[in-house]
Amino acid sequence: MSYYVPADRAARMCKHFDDEFMAEIAREQIPERAKEQLEKLPVDLMRGVTRQMLGSRDYHIMGGFTDYLPEEKAMILMEEIADPADSLRISSFAQRKDRIARLTVKMDDGEIKRLIEAAFKSPDFIREVGLVTAEMGAKDQQRMARLSDEVDPAHRARSREMAKANGLEERLQAFYAA
């Protein structure tokens, strides 16, 4: 039904549904077909859905929606994610790493440091941070390098191995040159 109802009407209808039902609807939707609804839906209604999906560990669904969610809403919803590892899990399912990179550079230094700390607890997370950082400009890569060094200077050397193995070293030149 949600694809066949005008987006503004669907957003008004959603105000009458509870978070659990909204999360069930989200699980059945195709994110690219819900883009207009994501634009119209008030972010306050999305907060509860975000918490529901975090609770049920629906990272793959959240990552898919991140590709189409307006960035200003994504920044607000990121406040609902307390565990940096959950942010990395969601990011790993997002296809548009350029969007994740733009969201990441808007974070404060403390938030990014927590992501870096979480990333170095799992090889998959290190790769994810590398993929996102590779989408950043030189200035932001240098910021990531500085923050990485503040967390642990050995992290950059460890990440370089991942970058070589995944063909990212050239795209991360500014990160390693810093």
Where are these regions (language model features)?
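Hydrophobic packing positions in regular secondary-structure scaffolds
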Residues: 1-178
